[in-house]
Amino acid sequence: MRILANKTRLPHPRRREAPGSPPLSPRGHCPPAPAKPMHPENKLTNHGKTGNGGAQSQHQNVNQGPTCNVGSKGVGAGNHGAKANQISPSNSSLKNPQAGVPPFSSLKGKVKRDRSVSVDSGEQREAGTPSLDSEAKEVAPRSKRRCVLERKQPYSGDEWCSGPDSEEDDKPIGATHNCNVADPAMAAPQLGPGQTTQLPLSESSVPGAPHGPPPGLRPDAPGGGGGGGGVPGKPPSQFVYVFTTHLANTAAEAVLQGRADSILAYHQQNVPRAKLDQAPKVPPTPEPLPLSTPSAGTPQSQPPPLPPPPPPAPGSAPPALPPEGPPEDSSQDLAPNSVGAASTGGGTGGTHPNTPTATTANNPLPPGGDPSSAPGPALLGEAAAPGNGQRSLVGSEGLSKEQLEHRERSLQTLRDIERLLLRSGETEPFLKGPPGGAGEGGPPAQAPPPPQQPPTAPPSGLKKYEEPLQSMISQTQSLGGPPLEHEVPGHPPGGDMGQQMNMMIQRLGQDSLTPEQVAWRKLQEEYYEEKRRKEEQIGLHGSRPLQDMMGMGGMMVRGPPPPYHSKPGDQWPPGMGAQLRGPMDVQDPMQLRGGPPFPGPRFPGNQIQRVPGFGGMQSMPMEVPMNAMQRPVRPGMGWTEDLPPMGGPSNFAQNTMPYPGGQGEAERFMTPRVREELLRHQLLEKRSMGMQRPLGMAGSGMGQSMEMERMMQAHRQMDPAMFPGQMAGGEGLAGTPMGMEFGGGRGLLSPPMGQSGLREVDPPMGPGNLNMNMNVNMNMNMNLNVQMTPQQQMLMSQKMRGPGDLMGPQGLSPEEMARVRAQNSSGVMGGPQKMLMPSQFPNQGQQGFSGGQGPYQAMSQDMGNTQDMFSPDQSSMPMSNVGTTRLSHMPLPPASNPPGTVHSAPNRGLGRRPSDLTISINQMGSPGMGHLKSPTLSQVHSPLVTSPSANLKSPQTPSQMVPLPSANPPGPLKSPQVLGSSLSVRSPTGSPSRLKSPSMAVPSPGWVASPKTAMPSPGVSQNKQPPLNMNSSTTLSNMEQGTLPPSGPRSSSSAPPANPPSGLMNPSLPFTSSPDPTPSQNPLSLMMTQMSKYAMPSSTPLYHNAIKTIATSDDELLPDRPLLPPPPPPQGSGPGISNSQPSQMHLNSAAAQSPMGMNLPGQQPLSHEPPPAMLPSPTPLGSNIPLHPNAQGTGGPPQNSMMMAPGGPDSLNAPCGPVPSSSQMMPFPPRLQQPHGAMAPTGGGGGGPGLQQHYPSGMALPPEDLPNQPPGPMPPQQHLMGKAMAGRMGDAYPPGVLPGVASVLNDPELSEVIRPTPTGIPEFDLSRIIPSEKPSSTLQYFPKSENQPPKAQPPNLHLMNLQNMMAEQTPSRPPNLPGQQGVQRGLNMSMCHPGQMSLLGRTGVPPQQGMVPHGLHQGVMSPPQGLMTQQNFMLMKQRGVGGEVYSQPPHMLSPQGSLMGPPPQQNLMVSHPLRQRSVSLDSQMGYLPAPGGMANLPF
């Protein structure tokens, strides 16, 4: 935060001052107060001259020296000088530095851009800062981008990614320092360069060189910045004026407020030297000395620093780092305080944010083995000092206790604010900074930073706690920074990361990443996941890899393999055992948190390791951080530990801590920090244990339980915090994933509680988490988030992922993996959301994860996502098979519901997460589903990537997870509305709805629980219960959601409302389509691919295609999208899925409600009822159906419900009704609407039951809203659509063949693929379908859609209006059906048999078909049921693909999916589980389907 604060404050001032010319501006800036800037900026500036007392000074001195030497210019230059270094080699000292900088020089340009030239992070910041500063804010995105760009630079890019992140971190720190420009700038440069470039070392050296002493020192200093500080550092220490963050911030504020001309001037005027001297004295003395010595190893000791510095400077950073690492720990603790250390810490640390990041980056590169070390110092500084620490560093260093406290408070405030604002506020900063960097280069950087922070934090926090030096500072810092950061350390880095990740991911996904990049990232993620898995080795490594991969993967995408590699090695290695936990822990919180539990390993080595591992992970995967942090969020993202944000990862871990700490947890727990601490330990221990246990146990069940418990705990601890983050940010991704999981678990545990209250928060978080896992998550977003996420970015994801992965690989493998993956997706996935889920998702989010989706798709797809998606249903079913899974589901739904409900973003996370969690767990049961989950993945990344993504994710998650999320997704959708999403979810759902949802959710959970039980038992019971719950909840939901949402949301649906409603329902679908389209399409494609490939490979191309499609789709979708765009995306994703999700959620509810949903729709009930009747029949079918319902409607709970109720109404529903229900329900509102719309629109439902239903259906159902337009028509339209669709779909469609089938059958295109069979269940020629070209080319598919649209046109009109897309959707659907998706759809429909009924019902058939198909289906279904199951499974798979299409219809899709190629896949899938998953998937797919389906459908 401090950094943030600085960043925010200082950067602004700086920005203001420096915004102008990066190089000059800073200079100018500095120049204004050349010495001053130097001085003020360099705390050490004054002493800087001297020795630049303290490495800081040194660094700063570097700047300072140069600055000082350079003089004003030096300062300016120094500050900027470093920048200058970067920017202008001309600075005399800088020149030297430049020498150091040369790379910098080269970096220089980049530096500027790269900020990463952490070299001058500060400088960069200064120089680059202008942009940087702007970027500071943008930093995450930009930084990330930069990172992305910078990625080119091995270290710079990466580091700089990190660096920038760092820079953000750094920047703030740098800013602070930069504010104290010279200080950090130089320090950063030193460190930054050194670390980053290692130039800093050189630079330090160089700058030092100019300094003479500094040079001498500098060499040392370079080594540690401290070196400079070391030699001169100590003395300079006397003079080193360390700026406290407070001071820097104050100065920045003053500048901003216009009280001061420049920060430097302000400092000159206002900074009491006594204080400075005093502070440095105090901390420096203790710190410098200790640090010095330890640090000495690092930078502090000049002698050691020298060596280390050189190492750092070289690539030895690791060496230096390692040496430093240990010392760093001390050093870190000390460093920040020590001037030298501070220098190191500050310089390095301060720099670190830049530098450490850089170093970290570097280190990470070196993998830093001690990123912590070299970066450690930096990290340390950063983490310790920078984290808070640079500020701390600087601040700490120069800070008096009072100042520290003040700063701490300020930081805390900032953090809180950020947390609130950002996915993971805390996380975000780091996330922003390191995560961003980490995210970009960030992973490494971030990892390092987190490592730094974690190390620092751990060291700082821990160590600091341990050490007096840092005790105070650390505490201050720790609390303020490290602790926060401690928690945040990991979190910030992680959280940040998560968030950043989520955000980044989102951003990346969106901003930085192109879908391709995202896809790449996904691939990377996958790659890393594999790699890591191998690399990591199974448990630990499994986890870690996953986590890393996932976390990292998400992020990894960013910090791709190389850095990751490096890091991972480090990471894994150090982290290996510890890291096991690390990853897990990382996941866990941070692993910092875990760290504490495993302080020894973690901290010392592990810490670093964690840092590396974690950090590495972080480094490696930003995601790890994300995961770890976001997810380590972020997250995942991840997650969560984003998401996760994850936004992820961050979310997860971070979320946990941060969020927990800051947010939910805080609310939940006494103090975030306290809670965090407790949690951390507890959690860590527990989690470690739990995680490990699960890991070790590997027992799915156990793992599941454990994980769940662990998650619950962790999540609870983390989750809430996460949650908020998630909610707030994509981080939710990560966080929520946790939340989700937590939610799931917790939901399980206390559905009502969690569900309602906590859950709402938590749940939201949970959902967010889920989604986050993505923000994921998630997501953010991640991001938040993301994410984290978003991380999620993620935590859950991460957690899931980590542990899951860990577990998964170990025991939980499938599920956990799936879950993790899903989470990962989510988290990462964050996410930010950070994604924020919006993210974060979005991530995360948590973070439109197109890319995320990609990875997720790949990842999740293969694993978690599907599972997640299906998990609830599927997983549960498969896993627990109903029982366990169901249970899982049960919780899931609750979690889902409430959480989903609660959070849109969280939804994403939560819904998703819960899905993930629950599902995941369940998923585990059906890992295959996991694949399907891909969508989830998509979803995950979706959230991660973006809101939409996040939402997508959400939807997906929700969809998959839970309709709940769906609702949430709508929220998220809206939210991507991240917050909105949460809100939205609730909100759209209508608060009431959502609330109800919560209610529902609660009920859902209740029913879930009940249903779970009941469901299984009494489908009806479930039906009842769900209906009941659902009704009340769902119905409410529906109503509210549908109605309300429909009205409101629905309206929104049309437009924004659509978002909610639509978002909820249709929007979700439709515009989910939109967003989802990307993801959806991606997912769709993905799914298709999945379907086709089930392997991610296609995914990539597919992904690309999907992207293209999406592009096209989006365009196509746009209408819808516009309507629901925002929401749609998220919602689409979320809603689509969301719809599915919400509907699922609701649907869930609805599905659960199925009857309810149906009820809601009324028609649906029809459908449902028939389905129910059918259901019963189909109970077997029900299974499928449930699946379907689940898949389709329930997606999550409904799925559950349905699924649960497989027999239950849901069953019915599920199969067909459910499908419709699902669709309807899914859209619940939409789908629910669909239900009725779906029912009616069954056609629509059929057509796009999910989709159009959503839309139309949703619209229709929610006719209220949409229905307005299409409401009447909608339903009719839906019917029409359904009919049209159906008609179109199959004129034959009617009963004979499921409409879908008929349609499909009729569909010429489909006809090739699908053949009617006596059973009435169409057979699909997967070979034809699978190509997933169509899905891939949703476009194509659309075109088909278009073809059919005419038919559907009428409906289309409404639909069209509804979304044309709807019509198109419908047509699309049918066309889709026909067209691949068409098939899917048609298939879906037809395939639905089990679900098809649903599908059909959904198709529009639902009602009809629901009725007929229902009946028909029943018969058909029944047989098909098995078939369906398989088919469903296939479908599912297909649905994965088709499902995408089917998203909304995921459920339908399910059928559709069935229809689609996936039938086989469906088989593939667990069949019904798959199918469920399909549904889920679909839901998840929702994004796919929703987006895809919906998008497709709609679009």
UniProtKB/Swiss-Prot annotation:
Q: What does this protein do?
A: Transcriptional regulator that acts as an activator. Promotes beta-catenin transcriptional activity. Plays a role in tumorigenesis. Enhances the neoplastic transforming activity of CTNNB1.
Question: Which Gene3D superfamilies does the UniProt record give?
Answer: Zinc/RING finger domain, C3HC4 (zinc finger)
Keyword hit for Transcription: yes
Asked if the Swiss-Prot or TrEMBL record annotates the protein with the keyword Phosphoprotein, the reply is: yes
From the UniProt entry, list the residue stretches annotated as the region Necessary for interaction with CTNNB1: 304-533
Q: Residue ranges under compositional bias (Basic and acidic residues)?
A: 114-126, 134-153, 399-421
Q: What is this protein called?
A: B-cell CLL/lymphoma 9-like protein
